[in-house]
């Protein structure tokens, strides 16, 4: 969808250790694809605006790591700034696409929350928490924001649209 992609920048709240792990895995995967990778370390809300200074000269696209605190709270601002800089964005949760992000691929959080409720129910009925097997997410959603794609001058290939779980107009 982004044919000119050679330089990928990863943005994340590095105060969150899971984000640090996510960035490490993304860095390795991007390098394996031959992409030049840079990182934007966000620690507080004020870092978001500063992060975009000169970013267009250093990046072809932006991957925004999922974070329940700083990044999620500023997702609309991040996507607005990225769109202003003509930078396509990729995210790990659909709510970021609702906030103007180009694409997301990640676990279906409502499904995960329902599964969590099932665990709570089992525990309240007497099951021992330590005896309940750990589960990994089983449903992942690909979401594409066509309005953002158009604003960036990008076209989503028909095959990609056919794979999408949701297309936001």
Model segments located where?
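Short hydrophobic alpha-helices and adjacent helix-cap/hinge residues
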Residues: 1-169
């Amino acid at each position: 969808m982004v044919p000119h992609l050679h330089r990928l920048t990863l943005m994340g709240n590095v105060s969150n250790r899971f984000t640090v792990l996510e960035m490490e895995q993304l860095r390795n995967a991007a390098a394996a694809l031959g992409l030049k990778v840079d990182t934007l370390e966000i620690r507080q809300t004020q870092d978001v605006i500063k992060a975009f200074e000169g970013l267009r000269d250093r990046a072809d696209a932006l991957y925004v790591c999922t974070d329940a605190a700083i990044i999620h709270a500023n997702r609309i601002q991040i996507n607005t700034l990225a769109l202003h800089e003509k930078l396509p964005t990729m995210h790990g949760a659909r709510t970021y696409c609702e906030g103007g992000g180009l694409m997301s691929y990640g676990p279906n959080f409502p499904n995960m929350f329902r599964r969590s409720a099932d665990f709570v129910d089992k525990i309240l009925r007497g099951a021992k928490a330590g005896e309940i097997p750990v589960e990994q997410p089983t449903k992942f959603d690909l979401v594409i924001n066509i309005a953002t794609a158009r604003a960036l001058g990008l076209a989503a290939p028909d095959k990609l649209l056919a794979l999408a779980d949701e297309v936001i107009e």
